[in-house]
């Protein structure tokens, strides 16, 4: 656990890595944590006020040098589906 001085410092610490599989935020303000995770955290997964194993119902995967793509959950199933575009003249 690394203590940050403010939100900007927390995001600098969290994103200062070439990897981006997952991270976590521990705080009493869960609404703020959700905003930070959604808008500023550069990882594929973020846990708020917890750490643990991956949930098979949630997408699992990272960004940056941790790779791209997702496993598990609905997003994981899309890795095994080929989308086809079919065009009709209007």
Predicted features by range, described:
Residues 1-90:
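Conserved C-terminal structural/oligomerization subdomain of aldehyde/semialdehyde dehydrogenase
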């Amino acid at each position: 656990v690394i203590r940050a001085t403010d939100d900007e410092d927390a995001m600098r610490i969290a994103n200062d890595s070439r990897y981006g599989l997952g991270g976590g935020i521990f705080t009493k303000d869960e609404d703020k944590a959700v905003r930070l995770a959604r808008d500023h955290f550069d990882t594929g997964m973020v846990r708020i006020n917890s750490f643990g194993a991956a949930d098979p119902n949630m997408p699992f995967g990272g960004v940056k040098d941790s790779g791209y793509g997702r496993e598990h959950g609905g997003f994981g199933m899309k890795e095994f589906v080929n989308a086809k575009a079919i065009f009709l003249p209007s």
